[in-house]
Amino acid sequence: MSTLVQCGYFERGQCQSCRHIKLPMVQQLAAKTQELQQLLAPFVVSTNTQFLPPVVGEDSGFRNKAKMVVLGAAHAPVLGIVSPNGEAVSLCDCLLYPADMQALLYRLERFVQQAGIPPYRIDKAKGELKYILLTRSQVRGEYMLRFVLRSPDAIARIERELPALMAEYPQINVVSVNIQPIHMAILEGDEEIFLTENTRLEERFNDVPLFIRPKSFFQTNPHVAAKLYQTAREWVGEFAPKSLWDLFCGVGGFGLHCASKDIPLTGIEIEAEAIACAKMSAQMMGLDNVQFMALDSTDFAKGDAAATKPDLIIVNPPRRGIGESLCDALSEFAPRAILYSSCNPKTLAKDLVHIRGYQLTRVQLFDLFPHSDHFEVLAMLVKDSR
């Protein structure tokens, strides 16, 4: 891992997404560690709380997903962003992407040109192609390619050029069109139209098969994410739980790492596509004592499910955290332990105020987002025996 990444886009002021890229990784990690320790200091009530060393990965070439705004014109498309001064900037060779992904992004610029699809102009409410979303699986280097269109009008042009693209890049496994008709900078709409027989991308973290569908959330740094899931498995394994809940479970990464044929698992996630992926993974793993349901996690916990209290609960909420209502429900369930995976330590700290009767015993930072302010935190809460 190098100590400093050189980015021309940042130097020229064209892209400021990696706001800390001029700092060596050691300094970036020190700042994140200090922030985490300060936020969680009020919850360290004894010397039993361990702050473990941060887990890091590569500082470039680590990202598995590109979200490209389509700019320019049909004869000269640009995949990237609008710079602070209003310039269309191609980010096909962004250093966060692996080399093969960069090459494919450049090829997709040519694809748009060959198809003659006009980029959407939000200021004029004209054009067709809004975004290109590209996701890479590390298993076989396969890709899921999504075109976000204003309407179905340009689908025929995509279908016309697609055979040549897929012959050149046979690792493109899934292709779809998302229809987003609203004249706003919204990433995707409700309608998804598949142009390939395959509708999901296979990934594997450690020994767990996982699946990615167009609208299911998936970690963007697979190397560090695999370590995150493995650490969760080890921490949970120390409790030998008799039953598990995985709330905000997504495609099932945490729960499937921690479940076994002897440990029943209930996974809850509001996104139906993610639940479909989790069910496929459980089937591949031969787990028949697992159930995944497309429900709101808070509604589930406060409903009839309260009658079947789990031995250990995993929560992996979005940036807003789990909220006071779910914190109250977890406190009432009083499981032996709660494993909280957070992508926002500020909301983690807010939630810890409302989770009553638990000690924070172990914390570890996972740097899934180098050069940014963001990071993931794994926190173990153990029922207070006092």
UniProtKB/Swiss-Prot annotation:
GO function terms (MF aspect): 4 iron, 4 sulfur cluster binding; iron ion binding; rRNA (uridine-C5-)-methyltransferase activity
Record-annotated active site: C343 (nucleophile)
GO BP term, pick one: rRNA base methylation
UniProt-listed Enzyme Commission number(s): 2.1.1.189
Residues annotated for S-adenosyl-L-methionine binding in this entry: Q219, F248, E269, N316
InterPro entries reported for this sequence: 23SrRNA_MeTrfase_RlmC, MeTrfase_TrmA_AS, MeTrfase_TrmA_CS, SAM-dependent_MTases_sf, U5_MeTrfase_fam
Catalytic activity: uridine(747) in 23S rRNA + S-adenosyl-L-methionine = 5-methyluridine(747) in 23S rRNA + S-adenosyl-L-homocysteine + H(+)
CDD domains: AdoMet_MTases
Chain sites annotated for binding [4Fe-4S] cluster: C7, C15, C18, C94
Pfam families per record: tRNA_U5-meth_tr
Keyword annotations of the record: 4Fe-4S, Iron, Iron-sulfur, Metal-binding, Methyltransferase, rRNA processing, S-adenosyl-L-methionine, Transferase
NCBIfam families given in the database record: meth_trns_rumB, rumA
Job description of the protein: Catalyzes the formation of 5-methyl-uridine at position 747 (m5U747) in 23S rRNA.
Stated family: Belongs to the class I-like SAM-binding methyltransferase superfamily. RNA M5U methyltransferase family. RlmC subfamily.
Protein name: 23S rRNA (uracil(747)-C(5))-methyltransferase RlmC
Species in which this protein is naturally found: Shewanella oneidensis (strain ATCC 700550 / JCM 31522 / CIP 106686 / LMG 19005 / NCIMB 14063 / MR-1)
Organism placement in taxonomy: Bacteria, Pseudomonadati, Pseudomonadota, Gammaproteobacteria, Alteromonadales
